[in-house]
Amino acid sequence: MKETKEIRMEKGKPYPLGWTENADGSVNLAAVLERSKECGVLLYPRRGGAPRRLAFREEDRIGKICCMKLIGLDAQEYEYNFYCGEEVITDPKARRICGNEKWGKKISPSLRSDSTEDAFDWKNDRRPQIPYENSIFYQLHVRGFTKHTSSGVTAKGTFAGLAEKIPYLKSLQVTAVELMPVYEFTELEAVKPLRQNAYPAKDQEGNPVEETLPRINYWGFKKGYYFAPKASYSVKDPVLEFKEMVRAFHAEGMEVILQFYFPKEINREMILEVIRYWVCEYHIDGVHLMGEQIPVGILAADPMLTDTKLIYYGFPYEEIYPVGQVPVSYTHLTLPTT
């Protein structure tokens, strides 16, 4: 029987939130968790078996943040979650999400966070940086665009399948694909109880029938795990496959724009961090922002996002850009939808 390695806990740092591997091989874990309950970390061995449970101590709390440093942990051997009382919490900062690889299948028992980071050779990748006024966007749903047999691709419903369609998109003179949400989200949603004014499903006799099957949120415009590409949109490795897709589009002089939906409970700092992450880690060319309380001004003023396309309905460009420095006449920018 293989011995369980000893893991030593020390006081950690509150930022950055999530899982961070330090230069000395230790791992820092930090999360916003309730103060009134016992909270901690669950470590799931990749080879199987019961999770290891490590509780945060009182001295590990700084404000609402719990943090710890783990020494002796082999990061490649574990997936993880946080817990608070009886609730298991998947890390909103996780760079990969495990357990939702099959589209429309029930998640059991819960999603798990994964910190794995693999090196990727971007080769000579360069962002095309096509001016707005010369852009022709093609909006699509990754799964819907390539899932049907008529798409003619091998890897149907995936990032790899979309890359196979580049010649077709180029033939339409498209300069950029705008992808509906590709961050990880749970598409299965609980059935809501029938409301008095709703239009319920009916049987052949016209009698209301209580729905029992979960509904599928096909489009993904909901709160999600914003740092992880959607696993069910890949053949095997969503991180690698998404990067390969972006690199393939760039090689043909085409841009990749992502749609993000942020409900009002997502704070402004988180939104900025998400966009910066995708620009740095995945080399995306722009974002189409949707939701409430989007900090458009902060994003537009961020030096790192100067060359990133920012699309937002009702964009307050006159409040953001100096006179004469607006990047495009927005009255001439159109977004075809297919």
Question: Residue ranges of each PLM-predicted region?
Answer:
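The feature marks proteins involved in alpha-glucan
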Residues: M1-D24, P51-R53, D60-H141, F145-G157
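Structural beta-strand segments of beta-rich domains
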Residues: G25-L29
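Conserved, mostly hydrophobic/aromatic
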Residues: A31, L140, L179, W278
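Short proline/glycine-enriched turn/loop motifs at strand-loop junctions of beta-rich domains
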Residues: L33-E38
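Catalytic domains of carbohydrate-active enzymes, especially glycoside hydrolases
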Residues: K165-P181
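Aromatic- and acidic-residue-enriched carbohydrate-binding clefts of CAZyme catalytic domains
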Residues: A190-A251, K264-E281
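Active-site neighborhood of glycoside hydrolase catalytic domains
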Residues: A251-E252, Y261-E319
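Conserved small/polar residues in nucleotide/adenosyl-binding loops
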Residues: T331-T337
